[in-house]
């Protein structure tokens, strides 16, 4: 029972009232008080307190709720042997207090990162899971044995788009995923083959322990906050049985970088990096009493690629790190290599004692993240794999794969070329290691997604020459590898004769290759049939045995010694998709079994046993990989990820997280709605305040204002009057005479002060943009137009109509734009001054209509932007018998601006041009 694991606290509320002071809390003191008041384990107490940001009252409340949880909510196996019947197993209050430092979440960004993941959905459940995992990892028989677990994200496709996006932002390192995908390092396999699942990087705490955090997340779904993996890493490097062998492998890989006197110092520094001690140390009493101010999150030393290799030995499973090869600056230029990417195998542990499913990590911006897949409704539709090659089908680096041996003399044997040659791993040897430690598979790439270079060629053309050259290169590579691996024995004439006989026999059997290849490719089979030679025989052996085990090749029985291998391989291979191998079913000899003799495949290989060192699986992988390097990219060489094994608390953690995420998502949506409503209310209030404001004065009375140039593009909208002539000078003079009788006092003052042309507008007319103002065709009895200041900002200085900005004027378009029936109304003279109410009606007759920029609204009384607004209207005198001065279109043809009487009804620019033209004309007279 959970209630038996968690004793009943005595006077919890009293303790909270006495001890809770958020300004002077010391975390060690709070932890001690919590343990003293509840009797809980320090690990559980610490998780509860950290989950509530060291709020003692809230942590005690969570503890009380946890006690009331029914046993059915937790697996029964965890409570075995933990009840009050065995008091000797109950932890003491001082147990596990010797931690490096207590973590606090003062930093808001760090707190968000630490509190948003699955591992913080329920601190109590995660603490129980951590304790269970720690008990499994401390098994007496295998002190470093780790159970095979692989974490998977829940299926998010069942949720709405908004909630799914919220969870992805909450759990996934978006920056890492985008960077690695754009670099072509991550999820390129799901692009070329839809049957492969995408891998997503989980958000990981960046405190220097991100490598172990990422490994813990990839297996169990929570961070390594108890430093279980970190301490195991340090212990293995310091006192582990594999210490010397690991050191030799590390030194061999670093041989070209260090000098002899630097080795011990480098190894000591490397050992210190793995320590579980943080960079910053604090006393247990929190310093001088100000625990909150003097304490901070511990930051650990960043780990290197060798620590990944040691971690593979601790977990006893391969580790694949997906990373870019070069570190780039902000401009994308590469300036430093990134050595982390590649494959790390537990080479110092026999393959039969290792887990074959690799742990996959991502590395970007000096930070590790766990790469996990997502559950699917139909698990058979997509498979979780990790390619062992890059997108160019080149094998990933195999780190620390060479051990020179105990008898290697550093500084002496380094110059022995013969001994160095024995230690160089060929591609064949690397593939053999991968087949030994992992479940490898070849995934067929659909023809429609293959790269152009990898498209199958026509089997009827002369493409056989290319295939023959490929076969020759494979034969030469095989010969070189065999001669290198068997350099002590050499290759005598008898072996060469056997090789020749084998090639002749392979040619006679080439007719059946296309039928026996299955998923390999019919096109490639036809090429092999033409003149493949050695490669056809290499593939023939494996596929023939697989088909015979499935009952598809009964007429080609093999030797008796291969029957066991045939039955095993036949049950594994699928003819339609891929061919995979398992380490538990290997015919490949492990590194520890090579000295005992040849493998079953070598013994049953007939005349090829001595000439070929590795199994048929390795031969097939080598041939396909070589073909991929030559352009025949039809398969992806990948390792299978086993996702069926999960720890007992996986479902509870996922359930708690989804519930918490739904609550946070609902709160976020509600906050957004409130913010939107507040913004809308503020906008409405601002609009109302703008409408109530007094009209703006566009200019100071008596001072001319320079005309404004439109901010829009330099496109001119004009009215070309081809059929009807523009108003002549006589009409202009009549209009000026009429305008003089209806001018307001303010207008007269302006005219008196502006005796000359209005300065200010210097750009030429074609580079300007404006709005067409057209006078009404007749007198209308309507109310005075609102002031300019009361209009919307978008209508105050209207833009040019977008639909006409890119096309020239035509009479048909002009007819649709104008509000008058004839062009003569544009030149209609204004009648004389009208007394009293007649003046008001006359002013209303000449109100202008404005076309705004795309709004389609006609604004009465809105004057042209380049012209001065009537003083009477700006002063609010509308309707009081004071009509403003009348403006007319510029007399110059094709000019869309307006002029005043003092400028002879030219616009200011045209008026200056007209004056200049007149001066030039007078100067040209004899």
Curated annotation (Swiss-Prot):
<feature type="domain" description="OTU">
    <location>
        <begin position="199"/>
        <end position="374"/>
    </location>
</feature>
<dbReference type="GO" id="GO:0070530">
    <property type="term" value="F:K63-linked polyubiquitin modification-dependent protein binding"/>
</dbReference>
<keyword id="KW-0597">Phosphoprotein</keyword>
<feature type="zinc finger region" description="A20-type">
    <location>
        <begin position="884"/>
        <end position="919"/>
    </location>
</feature>
<dbReference type="GO" id="GO:0071947">
    <property type="term" value="P:protein deubiquitination involved in ubiquitin-dependent protein catabolic process"/>
</dbReference>
<protein>
    <recommendedName>
        <fullName>OTU domain-containing protein 7A</fullName>
        <ecNumber>3.4.19.12</ecNumber>
    </recommendedName>
</protein>
<feature type="compositionally biased region" description="Basic and acidic residues">
    <location>
        <begin position="492"/>
        <end position="510"/>
    </location>
</feature>
<dbReference type="GO" id="GO:0008270">
    <property type="term" value="F:zinc ion binding"/>
</dbReference>
<dbReference type="Pfam" id="PF01754">
    <property type="entry name" value="zf-A20"/>
</dbReference>
<feature type="binding site">
    <location>
        <position position="895"/>
    </location>
    <ligand>
        <name>Zn(2+)</name>
    </ligand>
</feature>
<keyword id="KW-0645">Protease</keyword>
<dbReference type="InterPro" id="IPR002653">
    <property type="entry name" value="Znf_A20"/>
</dbReference>
<feature type="compositionally biased region" description="Low complexity">
    <location>
        <begin position="481"/>
        <end position="491"/>
    </location>
</feature>
<dbReference type="InterPro" id="IPR054109">
    <property type="entry name" value="UBA_8"/>
</dbReference>
<dbReference type="GO" id="GO:0016579">
    <property type="term" value="P:protein deubiquitination"/>
</dbReference>
<feature type="region of interest" description="Disordered">
    <location>
        <begin position="668"/>
        <end position="768"/>
    </location>
</feature>
<feature type="region of interest" description="TRAF-binding">
    <location>
        <begin position="168"/>
        <end position="410"/>
    </location>
</feature>
<keyword id="KW-0539">Nucleus</keyword>
<keyword id="KW-0991">Intellectual disability</keyword>
<comment type="function">
    <text>Deubiquitinase, which cleaves 'Lys-11'-linked polyubiquitin chains. Might be required for PA28-20S proteasome assembly.</text>
</comment>
<dbReference type="GO" id="GO:0035871">
    <property type="term" value="P:protein K11-linked deubiquitination"/>
</dbReference>
<feature type="region of interest" description="Disordered">
    <location>
        <begin position="452"/>
        <end position="514"/>
    </location>
</feature>
<feature type="binding site">
    <location>
        <position position="907"/>
    </location>
    <ligand>
        <name>Zn(2+)</name>
    </ligand>
</feature>
<keyword id="KW-0378">Hydrolase</keyword>
<dbReference type="Pfam" id="PF22566">
    <property type="entry name" value="UBA_8"/>
</dbReference>
<feature type="binding site">
    <location>
        <position position="910"/>
    </location>
    <ligand>
        <name>Zn(2+)</name>
    </ligand>
</feature>
<feature type="compositionally biased region" description="Low complexity">
    <location>
        <begin position="729"/>
        <end position="742"/>
    </location>
</feature>
<feature type="region of interest" description="Disordered">
    <location>
        <begin position="537"/>
        <end position="613"/>
    </location>
</feature>
<feature type="active site">
    <location>
        <position position="207"/>
    </location>
</feature>
<feature type="active site" description="Nucleophile">
    <location>
        <position position="210"/>
    </location>
</feature>
<feature type="region of interest" description="Disordered">
    <location>
        <begin position="75"/>
        <end position="99"/>
    </location>
</feature>
<dbReference type="GO" id="GO:0004843">
    <property type="term" value="F:cysteine-type deubiquitinase activity"/>
</dbReference>
<feature type="compositionally biased region" description="Low complexity">
    <location>
        <begin position="576"/>
        <end position="592"/>
    </location>
</feature>
<feature type="modified residue" description="Omega-N-methylarginine">
    <location>
        <position position="880"/>
    </location>
</feature>
<dbReference type="GO" id="GO:0003677">
    <property type="term" value="F:DNA binding"/>
</dbReference>
<feature type="binding site">
    <location>
        <position position="890"/>
    </location>
    <ligand>
        <name>Zn(2+)</name>
    </ligand>
</feature>
<comment type="similarity">
    <text>Belongs to the peptidase C64 family.</text>
</comment>
<dbReference type="InterPro" id="IPR003323">
    <property type="entry name" value="OTU_dom"/>
</dbReference>
<dbReference type="GO" id="GO:0005737">
    <property type="term" value="C:cytoplasm"/>
</dbReference>
<feature type="region of interest" description="Catalytic">
    <location>
        <begin position="183"/>
        <end position="449"/>
    </location>
</feature>
<feature type="compositionally biased region" description="Low complexity">
    <location>
        <begin position="677"/>
        <end position="691"/>
    </location>
</feature>
<feature type="short sequence motif" description="Nuclear localization signal">
    <location>
        <begin position="494"/>
        <end position="509"/>
    </location>
</feature>
């Amino acid at each position: 029972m959970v209630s038996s694991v968690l004793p009943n606290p005595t006077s919890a509320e009293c303790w909270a009232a006495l001890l809770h002071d958020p300004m002077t809390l010391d975390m060690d003191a709070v932890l001690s008080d919590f343990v003293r008041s509840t009797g809980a384990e320090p690990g559980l107490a610490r998780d509860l307190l950290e989950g509530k940001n060291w709020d003692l009252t809230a942590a005690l409340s969570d503890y009380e709720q946890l006690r009331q949880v029914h046993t059915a909510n937790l697996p029964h196996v965890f409570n075995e042997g933990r009840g009050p019947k065995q008091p000797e197993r109950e932890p003491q209050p001082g147990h596990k207090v010797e931690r490096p430092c207590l973590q606090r979440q003062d930093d808001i960004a760090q707190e968000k990162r630490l509190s948003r993941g699955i591992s913080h959905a329920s601190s109590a459940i995660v603490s129980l899971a951590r304790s269970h995992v720690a008990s499994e990892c401390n098994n007496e028989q295998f002190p470093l044995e780790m159970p095979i677990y692989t974490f998977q994200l829940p299926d998010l496709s069942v949720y709405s788009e908004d909630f799914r996006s919220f969870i992805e932002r909450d759990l996934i390192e978006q920056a890492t995923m985008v960077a690695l995908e754009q670099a072509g390092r991550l999820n390129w396999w799901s692009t070329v083959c839809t049957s492969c699942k995408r891998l997503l990087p989980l958000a990981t705490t960046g405190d220097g322990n991100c490598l172990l955090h990422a490994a813990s997340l990839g297996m169990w779904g929570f961070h390594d906050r108890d430093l279980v993996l970190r301490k195991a890493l340090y212990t293995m490097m310091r006192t582990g049985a594999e210490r010397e062998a690991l050191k030799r492998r590390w030194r061999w890989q670093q041989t070209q970088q260090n000098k002899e006197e630097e080795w011990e110092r480098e190894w000591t520094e490397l050992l210190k990096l793995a320590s579980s001690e943080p960079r910053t140390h604090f006393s247990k009493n929190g310093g001088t009493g100000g625990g909150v101010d003097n304490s901070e999150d511990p930051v650990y030393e960043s780990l290197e690629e060798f620590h990944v290799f040691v971690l593979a030995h601790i977990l006893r499973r391969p580790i694949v790190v997906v990373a870019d090869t070069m570190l780039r600056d902000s401009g994308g230029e590469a300036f430093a290599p990134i050595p982390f990417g590649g494959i790390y195998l537990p080479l110092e542990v026999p393959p039969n004692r290792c887990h074959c499913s690799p742990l996959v990590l991502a590395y970007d911006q000096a930070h590790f993240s766990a790469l996990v897949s997502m559950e699917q409704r139909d698990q058979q539709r997509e498979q979780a794999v990790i390619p062992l090659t890059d997108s160019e089908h080149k094998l990933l680096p195999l780190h620390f794969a060479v051990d020179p041996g105990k008898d290697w003399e550093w500084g002496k044997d380094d110059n022995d070329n013969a001994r160095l040659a024995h230690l160089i791993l060929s591609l064949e040897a690397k593939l053999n290691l991968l087949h030994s430690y992992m479940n490898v598979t070849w995934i067929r790439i659909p023809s429609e997604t293959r790269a152009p270079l990898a498209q199958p060629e026509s089997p009827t053309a002369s493409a056989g020459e290319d295939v023959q050259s490929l076969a020759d290169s494979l034969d030469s590579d095989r010969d070189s590898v065999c001669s290198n691996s068997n350099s002590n024995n050499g290759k005598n004439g008898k072996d060469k004769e056997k090789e020749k006989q084998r090639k002749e026999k392979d040619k006679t059997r080439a007719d059946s290759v296309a039928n026996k290849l299955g998923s390999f490719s019919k096109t490639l089979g036809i090429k092999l049939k033409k003149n493949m030679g050695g490669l056809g025989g290499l593939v023939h052996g494996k596929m023939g045995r697989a088909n015979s085990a499935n009952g598809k090749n009964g007429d080609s029985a093999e030797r008796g010694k291969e029957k066991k291998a045939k039955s095993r391989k036949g049950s594994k291979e699928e003819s339609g998709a891929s061919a995979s191998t398992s380490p538990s079913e290997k015919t490949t000899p492990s590194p520890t079994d090579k000295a005992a003799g040849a493998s079953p495949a070598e013994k049953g290989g007939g005349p090829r046993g001595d000439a070929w060192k590795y199994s048929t699986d390795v031969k097939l992988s080598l041939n396909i990989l070589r073909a991929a390097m030559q352009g025949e990219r039809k398969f992806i060489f990948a390792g299978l990820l086993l996702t069926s094994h999960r720890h007992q608390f996986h479902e509870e953690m996922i359930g708690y997280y989804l519930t918490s995420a739904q609550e946070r998502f609902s709160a976020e949506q509600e906050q957004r709605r409130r913010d939107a409503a507040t913004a809308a209310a503020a906008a409405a209030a601002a609009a109302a305040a703008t409408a109530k404001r007094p009209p703006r004065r566009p200019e100071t009375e008596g001072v001319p204002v320079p005309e404004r140039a439109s901010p829009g593009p330099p496109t001119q909208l004009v009215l070309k009057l081809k059929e009807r002539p523009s108003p002549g000078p006589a009409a202009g003079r009549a209009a000026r005479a009429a305008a003089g009788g209806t001018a307001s006092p303010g207008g007269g003052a302006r005219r008196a002060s502006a005796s000359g042309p209005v300065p200010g507008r210097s750009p030429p007319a074609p580079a300007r943009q404006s709005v067409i103002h057209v006078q009404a065709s007749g007198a209308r009895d309507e109310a005075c137009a609102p002031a300019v200041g009361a209009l919307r900002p978008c209508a105050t200085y209207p833009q040019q109509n977008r639909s006409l900005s890119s096309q020239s004027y035509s009479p048909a378009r002009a007819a649709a734009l104008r509000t008058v029936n004839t062009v003569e109304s544009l030149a209609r003279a204004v009648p004389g001054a009208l007394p009293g109410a007649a003046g008001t009606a006359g002013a209303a007759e000449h109100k202008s209509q404005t076309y705004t920029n795309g709004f389609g609204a006609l604004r009465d009384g809105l004057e042209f932007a380049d012209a001065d607004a009537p003083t009477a209207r700006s002063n609010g005198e509308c309707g009081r018998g004071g009509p403003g001065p009348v403006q007319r279109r510029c007399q110059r043809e094709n000019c869309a601006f307006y002029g005043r009487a003092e400028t002879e009804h030219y616009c200011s620019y045209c008026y200056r041009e007209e004056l200049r033209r007149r001066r030039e004309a007078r100067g040209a007279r004899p």
